[in-house]
Amino acid sequence: MRVAVTGGCGFIGSHVVDKLRDQQIDVRVLDNQGAPHRDDVDHVRADIMDQGVLNEATRGIDVVYHLAAVADVNNVAADPTGSVALNVLGTANVLEAARTNQLRRVILASTVWVYGAAREERVDEGVCFDPALTGHVYTTTKIASEMLCHDYKTMYGVPFTVLRYGIPYGPRMRPSLVIPIFMRKAIGGEPMTVAGDGSQNRKFVYVEDLADAHVLALAPEAENQTYNIDGSEEVTILRIAETVHRLLGGKGIEFVPARTGDYGGKQVSSMKAAREIGWTPKVNFDAGMERTVAWFLETQGQTALNPA
């Protein structure tokens, strides 16, 4: 089998590549933002906004994992039109390339942020969304991307799988994510800032557990299905700050006003993924944080005070 991974040089994408190679699957990384972290994969500097390049880059591929997107909600808020273009049109371009080259599957990276548009507090893959509740352009781009997958299946017969990620953490995290920010502040002697009262909860999912789901999603049972890939423990932002403080010390916590449109968290069930493709998270939050802090100190400890 030959697969392509858009965004394969990124935080999650690089771990997906690792898990695929562990299974001896041939991988082509499609990414114009950097180079792969390993040399046993093909690399094409493909821009997902360039349909011709994308068509050529996916020729001879069986399955494409589509992870390339504007994933930082702050960047989406700062540039909504550019984010809509990349996240929505980019997904359409990937689906069109799959149609052109008759790929066996498109596996889409989505997010539990889509449940911000659900009225229910306890949610699974079958809940309906209310457009009036999306609350953030990022949420809307992900719902639109999922809808395009369904449309391309209905209209053109392109099979898909949607993976709705919980909040990922672990080695290779982007510097702009909350855990690396907290770690830099802790070792820099600055207080960690927490939005609101810190009670916002997510089931943070360790990145290697998340990456495992991408291999399991190749199963025939996953075709044309959507799965929540979320952690097993409810973790508040305040607990993250307290954990970083415990592991790294620092000046403690400072509370600031909440962000507009922030996803407040839902009770997300991942039982469908456990039942149908055998996925469950294995790394608990404390163990994952210990690994993440160890990676951070090993790779960025000398430069953490002045990140690029």
Predicted regions and their residues:
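Rossmann-fold cofactor-recognition segment
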Residues: 40-50
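C-terminal substrate-binding subdomain of Rossmann-fold SDR/epimerase-dehydratase oxidoreductases
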Residues: 186-308
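A conserved pocket-lining segment of Rossmann-fold NAD(P)-dependent short-chain dehydrogenase/reductase
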Residues: 75-76, 128-135, 158-171, 182-205, ...
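N-terminal Rossmann NAD(P)H-binding glycine-rich loop of SDR-like oxidoreductase domains
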Residues: 3-23
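Conserved glycine-rich Rossmann-like NAD(P)H-binding loop of the short-chain dehydrogenase/reductase
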Residues: 25-34
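Catalytic helix-loop patch of NAD(P)-dependent Rossmann-fold dehydrogenases
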Residues: 78-93, 100, 105, 114-162, ...
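SDR active-site strand-loop-helix element
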Residues: 6, 30, 64-67, 106-112, ...
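NAD(P)H-binding glycine-rich loop region in Rossmannoid oxidoreductase-like domains
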Residues: 48-86, 97
